[in-house]
Structures are given as C-alpha cells and as structure tokens.
Curated annotation (Swiss-Prot):
Name by which UniProt lists this protein: Putative pre-16S rRNA nuclease
InterPro entries referenced in this protein's UniProt entry, alphabetically: RNaseH-like_sf, YqgF, YqgF/RNaseH-like_dom, YqgF/RNaseH-like_dom_sf
Location of this chain's protein in the cell: Cytoplasm
Phosphoprotein recorded as keyword: no
Keywords: Cytoplasm, Hydrolase, Nuclease, Ribosome biogenesis
Stored PANTHER family: POLYNUCLEOTIDYL TRANSFERASE, RIBONUCLEASE H-LIKE SUPERFAMILY PROTEIN
Keyword field contains Nuclease: yes
Organism: Legionella pneumophila subsp. pneumophila (strain Philadelphia 1 / ATCC 33152 / DSM 7513)
One Gene Ontology biological process: rRNA 5'-end processing
A GO term from the CC aspect: cytosol
CDD domains, sorted: YqgF
GO molecular function: nuclease activity
Domain of life: Bacteria
Length: 139
C-alpha cells in the first residue's frame, strides 16, 4: 500500500464528515464537515478538499447494524462512494463504520461533557475513526 495522504468520509444526508490521515503513522485527524442537501453532497467543496490534499485514495464509511443488516443509509453511502470514484478517478474503499458515531460522541464527551458534543464535530471525528480503522486494517 503506497504511503501518502488518505481522506475519510462519514456520509450523511445532512452532513458529511471529512478526515485526513496518513499511512506512515496510521493516524487521522478530523478535517471538516461538508453540508449536504437531502443526501446530495456539495461536490464543489469536496473537489476543493480533494484538490488541496491530493489523496492516494478515499475511504467511505458503510453504515450497517450490529447484526450485519443494512440500514437505509447503506445504499446511499455506496452510491456516494461510486460517485466519488467516477468524479475523481481515485480508488475508493468502503469500511464498516459500525459504532463510529458512538465512538466519536464518547471522545467528545471525554473532552468536556455534553457541551462539547456538536453535530458537525461528531461527523468529522466519526470520519477520523473510519479512516484510522481502514489504515490499521490495510497495513
């Protein structure tokens, strides 16, 4: 697996969390949250992020239930991943994002209680969790 920069996405109908990470340290950092309207991403903003970071690949969280059933957002996340590949000609990898939002909320709670839990931050930290999981699994 080439060393370099990778972008992680936590797809949602209202917001898409974005994180940036690197293979060398298998770590990621929350980057931003991109607004979506009725599940339609802001492709201009996504293009700016991709142009700025020039990633080796894009990682998209795939929402599923604990018992492996697919959620209503699973097909939308798959569609988003396919659109990313088609628009930007980059490899796109899907990662089981089970409990990534719960983990992100827990992290924010540890940082300062309920006052620290902001939806936009949860999404970008969830993207960070997704990306770090992929980086560690693909070593």
């Amino acid at each position: 697996m080439p060393r370099g920069v990778y972008l992680g996405f936590d797809f949602g109908y209202k917001r898409i969390g974005v994180a940036v990470g690197q293979r060398l340290t298998c770590s990621a950092s929350p980057l931003s949250t991109i607004e979506a309207k009725a599940g339609i991403p802001d492709w201009n903003t996504i293009q700016k992020v991709i142009t700025q970071w020039n990633p080796q690949a894009l990682i998209v969280g795939l929402p599923t239930c604990i018992d492996d059933r697919e959620l209503y957002t699973t097909s939308a996340a798959r569609r988003f991943a396919k659109q990313l590949h088609k628009r930007f000609s980059l490899p796109v990898h899907l990662v089981d994002e089970r409990l990534s939002t719960v983990e992100a909320r827990g992290y924010l709670f540890e940082q300062g209680g309920y006052r620290q839990i902001k939806k936009a931050e949860v999404d970008s930290i969830a993207a960070c969790v997704i990306l770090e999981q992929w980086l560690q699994q693909s070593e």
